[in-house]
């Protein structure tokens, strides 16, 4: 149970970091 929760949290963190980097790159390209 704990391993599944930690793995899900890791996926959420990775997704948020990648999405943030992608949005940042798009903003830099727009400038």
From Swiss-Prot:
It holds the Pfam family PetL. Keywords: Electron transport, Membrane, Photosynthesis, Plastid, Thylakoid, Transmembrane, Transmembrane helix, Transport. Its main location: plastid. Component of the cytochrome b6-f complex, which mediates electron transfer between photosystem II (PSII) and photosystem I (PSI), cyclic electron flow around PSI, and state transitions. PetL is important for photoautotrophic growth as well as for electron transfer efficiency and stability of the cytochrome b6-f complex. It comes from the Eukaryota. The keyword Transmembrane helix applies. GO terms for cellular component: cytochrome b6f complex; plastid thylakoid membrane. One of its GO terms (biological process) is photosynthesis. It is found in: Plastid thylakoid membrane. The keyword Plastid applies. It is a single-pass membrane protein. This is Cytochrome b6-f complex subunit 6. PANTHER family: CYTOCHROME B6-F COMPLEX SUBUNIT 6. One of its GO terms (molecular function) is electron transporter, transferring electrons within cytochrome b6/f complex of photosystem II activity. The chain crosses the membrane at residues 4-24. The 4 large subunits of the cytochrome b6-f complex are cytochrome b6, subunit IV (17 kDa polypeptide, PetD), cytochrome f and the Rieske protein, while the 4 small subunits are PetG, PetL, PetM and PetN. The complex functions as a dimer. Belongs to the PetL family. InterPro entries: Cyt_b6/f_cplx_su6 (IPR007802).
């Amino acid at each position: 149970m704990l391993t599944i929760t930690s793995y899900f949290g890791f996926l959420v963190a990775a997704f948020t970091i990648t999405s943030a980097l992608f949005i940042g790159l798009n903003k830099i390209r727009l400038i």
